[in-house]
Structures are given as structure tokens and as C-alpha cells.
């Protein structure tokens, strides 16, 4: 709990004056003011978050957190839980979607085992920080204890602290965990007070009958556990996931260390939402990578006040959207740093 409390105490609002100064710098580039649209918004936010009007773009890292889910026992996913460790091994071999898109973006992928029901051998690129071998079935009991939830959050915070020490310029979130759209739907339903049906979709591609079953299972879990929306740790521990907790910690740690954090899709945003509910200033450090096909994602983004960078009908997770968005954020930063001013170019300004 000490690491979590320390991180929360360090999170400060982003300096509004830096946002204004960064925009003034952009307005002096050889272009009409605001003509690069959202690229300029990304650039000024990146500068203000880092506290540097000429931010350096060094290493970019996507942390893909993996964990299993007891709720899979209820038949809410198209795939068995054995796919979770199989996909982790695919990540480590560099063969997954996130690996391909991260290579394209010039980002590194680090896989974090925070709760997979499998014993991995030590492998390059794999960070083993297992809190438990998956959550329990939240349709029958709490997904985890409060202590387990805090421990998983602190895994993410520690990784953000290490990223700061390494000089990493930008971090992204990703996840792998069969069944993890169910806890994500439960989390937003708990906070928003909406119906489960409004925030639950097909996940890995289940049919109509399976979707109806999934909605009933999630509702049963919420009715049983009665998570308190005023207590983010209560929501997380009762209906969440270990990888969702790890992501929440990474987002909190990034905010505490003034590192821009690119949040992927539905499951990653569930983690970011937990972080934002724990500290209101966290939202200022988040870049929402994209708008997911999962219907609950839009409600999450509205609640944290984040505008998605991309809308590509993505629903894979892993950090794929974060990898794509990182390239656009970096493009905005390059405009801020490399584009000539009117004076430098000998061009008359308005």
C-alpha cells in the first residue's frame, strides 16, 4: 500500500501555462495557426506533461499485462483460458498483432505476467510479477482480495518508476486475458450505474445467445458483490482483473512520473478508469489511443474525459491501438521540435 499511497501523493495537475506556451510555439511555425489540428493538441499536451517545450522522443514501450479470469468458468468467452499463456508465448516470439504494430511504430513490447494460470520460464521480454494464478469467478465470489488488487496495482506503479529511471519517453498499455471484457463491462457498469446490457458486447466474437448469457452472468456478479462506486479498490477487487489492476498502476505511476501514457482499448481503459477514479488529475496524462468496437468503451472515455485519437474499428487489445497512436503522437512532437519558424524560414507571418 505504501507504493500506491506515494504515487497518489506525487500526482499533480498538468501546468496550464505550459500548454499555452507550447501552443504559442506551434503558432510560430510556418503554417496557419491550428492548421495541423489534433497533431498540435497532442504536441502541446506531450510538452506540458513532460514539462519540456522541446521534448525529446526516446524509447517508447508498450507494457502488455496478462492475467486469467475465473469468470471464464461461466462460458462468457469463445476461447478457453489456455489461450492466455499461448498468446503470451506468441508475444515473446514477436508474432502477435501488437509485436507487428509496435515494430512499425519503433516501440518495444514488454509482457508482464501479473496473473496467468501458467508457470513461465524466465524469458527475455517477460516480466514475471505474478500476484495469483488468475482471479476467482466473480459470479460466485469476489474476483480477488483487496490486498491482491493493491499488489497488482503496485506492479504497474513500479514499472512506471523503472521507466522513468530508464528515460523512457512514452509508455503504452496493452493486455491479454481470456474473458477480460466481462470484468471491464462490470467495472464501467458499477461506476456509471448503467445497465450491463448498455456496456456489454461480443468480446472475442460470441453469438447472440452467448451474449445474452454473458450479460446475465455479469449482472449476477454485480448483484452478488455490490461493488461500491465510491471506492475504486472495492470495484476492482470485487469484479476486476489482475491485468486491469496492473494497467491501473502503470497509468498512476506514469502520471506520478510525468510520463505520457497511451491507453489502448476497452480493457486497458477499464484500468485507466480505475486510476482516474483514484485520482482526478490522472486523466491529464492519458492519451486515448482509439475508439473500440466494444460498446462500453465510449462510456468509459466519456467518464474520464478522453478523446480517442483513432477510430479504426479495432477490438483486438494487446496494445495494438496504442502502438498505432504512438506514431501520431510522435509526429506531433516532431512538428513542435523540427518545423521551422517564420523567422527561420524567411516567411512573412500574418
From Swiss-Prot:
Protein's pathway: Nucleoside biosynthesis; alpha-ribazole biosynthesis; alpha-ribazole from 5,6-dimethylbenzimidazole: step 1/2
GO biological process, one term: cobalamin biosynthetic process
Keywords in alphabetical order: Cobalamin biosynthesis, Glycosyltransferase, Transferase
GO molecular function, one term: nicotinate-nucleotide-dimethylbenzimidazole phosphoribosyltransferase activity
Top EC class of this enzyme: transferase
Reaction(s) this enzyme catalyzes, per UniProt: 5,6-dimethylbenzimidazole + nicotinate beta-D-ribonucleotide = alpha-ribazole 5'-phosphate + nicotinate + H(+)
Highest taxon above the source species: Bacteria
SUPFAM superfamilies: Nicotinate mononucleotide:5,6-dimethylbenzimidazole phosphoribosyltransferase (CobT) (SSF52733)
EC number assigned by the record: 2.4.2.21
Active site: 318
Family, per entry: Belongs to the CobT family.
PANTHER family in UniProt: NICOTINATE-NUCLEOTIDE--DIMETHYLBENZIMIDAZOLE PHOSPHORIBOSYLTRANSFERASE
Function in brief: Catalyzes the synthesis of alpha-ribazole-5'-phosphate from nicotinate mononucleotide (NAMN) and 5,6-dimethylbenzimidazole (DMB).
Record's protein name: Nicotinate-nucleotide--dimethylbenzimidazole phosphoribosyltransferase
Classification of source organism: Bacteria, Pseudomonadati, Thermodesulfobacteriota, Desulfuromonadia, Geobacterales
Amino acid at each position: 500500500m505504501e507504493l500506491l499511497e506515494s504515487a497518489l501523493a506525487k500526482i499533480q495537475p498538468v501546468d496550464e501555462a505550459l500548454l499555452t506556451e507550447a501552443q504559442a510555439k506551434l503558432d510560430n511555425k510556418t503554417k496557419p495557426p491550428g492548421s495541423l489540428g489534433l497533431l498540435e493538441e497532442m504536441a502541446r499536451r506531450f510538452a506540458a506533461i513532460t514539462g519540456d517545450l522541446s521534448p525529446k522522443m526516446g524509447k517508447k514501450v508498450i507494457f502488455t499485462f496478462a492475467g486469467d479470469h475465473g469468470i471464464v468458468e461461466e462460458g462468457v468467452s469463445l476461447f478457453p483460458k489456455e489461450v492466455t499463456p499461448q498468446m503470451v508465448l506468441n508475444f515473446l516470439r514477436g508474432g502477435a498483432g501488437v509485436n507487428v504494430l509496435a515494430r512499425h511504430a519503433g516501440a518495444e513490447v514488454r509482457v508482464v505476467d501479473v496473473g496467468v494460470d501458467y508457470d513461465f520460464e524466465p524469458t527475455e521480454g517477460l516480466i514475471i510479477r505474478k500476484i495469483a494464478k488468475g482471479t476467482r469467478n466473480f459470479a460466485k465470489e469476489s474476483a480477488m482480495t483487496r490486498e491482491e488488487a493493491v499488489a497488482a496495482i503496485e506492479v504497474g506503479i513500479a514499472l512506471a518508476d523503472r521507466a522513468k529511471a530508464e528515460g523512457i519517453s512514452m509508455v503504452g498499455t496493452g493486455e491479454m486475458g481470456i474473458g477480460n471484457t466481462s470484468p471491464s463491462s462490470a467495472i464501467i457498469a458499477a461506476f456509471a450505474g448503467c445497465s450491463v446490457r448498455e456496456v456489454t458486447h461480443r468480446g472475442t466474437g460470441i453469438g447472440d445467445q452467448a451474449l445474452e448469457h454473458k450479460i446475465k452472468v455479469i449482472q449476477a456478479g454485480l448483484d452478488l458483490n455490490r461493488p461500491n462506486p465510491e471506492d475504486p479498490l472495492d470495484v476492482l477487487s470485487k469484479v476486476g482483473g489482475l491485468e486491469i489492476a496492473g494497467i491501473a498502476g502503470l497509468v498512476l505511476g506514469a502520471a506520478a512520473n510525468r510520463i505520457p501514457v497511451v491507453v489502448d482499448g476497452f480493457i486497458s481503459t477499464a484500468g485507466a478508469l480505475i486510476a482516474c477514479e483514484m485520482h482526478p488529475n490522472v486523466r491529464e496524462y492519458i492519451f486515448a489511443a482509439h475508439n473500440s468496437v466494444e460498446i462500453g468503451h465510449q462510456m468509459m472515455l466519456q467518464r474520464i474525459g478522453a478523446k480517442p485519437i483513432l477510430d479504426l474499428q479495432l477490438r483486438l487489445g494487446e496494445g495494438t491501438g496504442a502502438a498505432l497512436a504512438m506514431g501520431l503522437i510522435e509526429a506531433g512532437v516532431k512538428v513542435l521540435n523540427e518545423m521551422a519558424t517564420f523567422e527561420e524560414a524567411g516567411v512573412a507571418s500574418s
